[in-house]
Amino acid sequence: HSQNHPLRPTIAGQPPPAESKELAVPKQSKYKGWHISQFIENKSLPWALMGLFIGFTYSGVLVFIPIELNSMGAGIWGSAFFAIFALMIIISRPIVGKIYARYGSKIIIYTGLGLFILGLFVLGLAITPLAILFTAPLLGLGYGAAQPAFQALAIQSAPIERAGVSTATYFLALDISVGAGSVILAL
């Protein structure tokens, strides 16, 4: 490792060295006061809608798992399910990032959605706590691959000076879908 690593001064409590890159200065809004374009980036909407789809579906898992396991008398298995689900997301992220960088988004999205859909299908057939637990890795890997790929594509779809608004657009759709989906699918 080099002595001149860019993080070295930051870790030592010193400011990082100045870079020669020019920063993009945000453009002045053409609207006075409040306008929806301050919060929503239209170019990011297709990917935000994909995030909405996966978030809505994920919210069904959040609602269904505890209820179903409790009805089987195996409520304690819910903790194991969500621990495995989260572990698969954590494990998948660095691997998914490298594959995304090398091969592009399509392989990540198709594989992620395929695993997530397979997990949902198996979950729909599951009649034992162990079968439900078996779906956690499939759902976790699928969600852990597809969700950040959609987020990255939402951000990349807009001009760099709108990256923050693109991020907000994506997470607005994701948050709405998880919140609304939990209510709608629990009915």
Protein language model annotation of sequence segments:
Residues 124-135:
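Helix-loop junctions at membrane interfaces in 12-TM secondary transporters
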